[in-house]
């Protein structure tokens, strides 16, 4: 859900995750982008202390690793002074986490706002503002995140900026959260090679790409984006690596199947050197099944002997961190999908055992077919790299 950030700032957001990357790598990523910035915002995920193992991997841990203050955003809907007990708990739970101030969300009236500000006065913590309920900013959700398809993003961004400026004390917020960036942290220098790398990307079916991955790939050559829904976007013969990231192919199955020239070119080249993650892997199946009664399916690339079902009857949430060792490289990532593999050829087996965040085995498959690597897992290779995964490095 980083599309708001990119729309408002004009630059992509980067991933900071203590499960998927080392503390040193997180510092390098943060410093490399913070050293020339005026303002840096690290958005927390879930609750402040929610991690993959108690508070490990939580927003609180990231704040400690990067030495950043925390602005606590509190949902004040249908609540008032009872929130004081909760906020007090956040303030005292971990003395190493600095809570710089509080923003209340969904305040209902002037009197409600007055009551909320009294909480901060009594707890001696700055109140940075109270955001009122505002239906125009309410976003619909869908099974894998926020749904931006029905909104005018330009209008939303402008409206949001006006509301924040009116209801938050932005100058004070920037003042009390100001910190020096540790520019002594060494940032690895990029290398420069001349590979030819093609990446599937559009607004829907191939829309989930870590910005770090694009930075990484750009070190190894020229990155060209293509839209698999565009039948003229045929993958050329001289491509060294084909990257099919995640997205919502189930929402665009008809459009994907209606581009047979692209399908044929992807099938011809993906085996030479390719990575397919989640939606990208679904695209490589023989069919994407949308309904079983009546049977409705769309032809996909057919590089992997299996089908993928996005039928309501088959949909089950698979979510969580994943890790595995492959060819001497420890890879980590995240899995989040509802579709599932069906009619899998018995010869198509996982190349490795995959584990969850606590080290317990899960049935997520990592397919190794010729020089293709495919899985439901969105891998993070901003730190580990990917070239050692291939039996033959693409392009060599």
Segment roles from a protein language model:
Residues 30-31, 137-152, 238-243, 320-322:
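Short, surface-exposed amphipathic charged segments that create phosphate/polyanion-binding patches used
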Residues 6, 170, 190-193, 207-216, ...:
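C-terminal and late-domain segments of enzyme folds
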Residues 81-189:
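Internal gly/pro-rich beta-alpha loop/helix module
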Residues 1-66, 74-98, 110-114:
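ATP-dependent carboxylate-amine ligase catalytic core
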Residues 249-323:
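Cysteine-nucleophile active-site neighborhood
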Residues 195-200, 204-268:
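Phosphate-binding active sites in nucleotide-utilizing proteins
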Residues 41-43, 71, 75-76, 103, 105-108, 198, 200-204, 376-380, ...:
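Structural motif
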């Amino acid at each position: 859900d980083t599309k708001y950030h990119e729309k408002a700032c004009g630059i992509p957001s980067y991933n900071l995750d203590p499960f998927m990357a080392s503390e040193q790598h997180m510092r390098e990523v943060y410093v490399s982008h913070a050293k020339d910035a005026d303002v840096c915002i690290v958005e927390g995920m879930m609750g402040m202390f929610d991690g993959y193992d108690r508070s490990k991997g939580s927003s609180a841990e990231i704040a400690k690793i990067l030495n950043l203050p925390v602005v606590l955003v509190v949902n004040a809907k249908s609540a008032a002074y009872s929130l004081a007990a909760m906020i007090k708990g956040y303030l005292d739970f971990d003395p190493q986490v600095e809570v710089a101030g509080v923003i209340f969300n969904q305040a209902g009236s002037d009197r409600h706002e007055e009551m909320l500000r009294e909480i901060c006065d009594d707890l001696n913590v700055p109140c940075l503002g109270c955001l009122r309920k505002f239906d125009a900013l309410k976003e619909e959700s869908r099974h894998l995140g926020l749904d931006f398809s029905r909104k005018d993003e330009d209008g939303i961004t402008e409206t949001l900026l006006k509301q924040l400026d009116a209801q938050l004390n932005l100058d004070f917020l920037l003042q009390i959260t100001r910190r020096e960036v540790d520019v002594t942290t060494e940032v690895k220098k990029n290398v420069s090679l001349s590979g030819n790398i093609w990446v599937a990307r559009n607004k829907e079916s191939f829309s989930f790409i870590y910005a770090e991955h694009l930075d990484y790939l750009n070190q190894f050559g020229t990155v060209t984006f293509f839209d698999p829904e565009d039948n003229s976007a045929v993958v050329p013969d001289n491509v060294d690596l084909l990257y099919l990231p995640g997205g919502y192919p189930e929402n665009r199955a008809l459009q994907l199947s209606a581009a047979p020239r692209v399908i044929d070119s992807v099938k011809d080249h993906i085996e030479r050197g390719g990575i397919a993650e989640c939606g990208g892997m679904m695209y490589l199946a023989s069919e994407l099944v949308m309904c079983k009664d009546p049977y409705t399916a769309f032809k996909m690339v057919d590089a992997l002997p299996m089908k993928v079902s996005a039928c309501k009857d088959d949909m089950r949430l698979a979510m969580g961190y994943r890790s595995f060792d492959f060819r001497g490289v420890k890879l980590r990532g995240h899995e989040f999908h509802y579709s599932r593999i069906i009619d899998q050829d018995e010869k198509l087996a996982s190349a490795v055992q995959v584990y969850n965040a606590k080290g317990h085995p899960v049935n997520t498959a990592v397919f190794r077919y010729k020089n293709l690597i495919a899985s439901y897992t969105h891998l993070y290779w901003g730190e580990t790299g990917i070239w050692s995964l291939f039996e033959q490095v693409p392009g060599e």
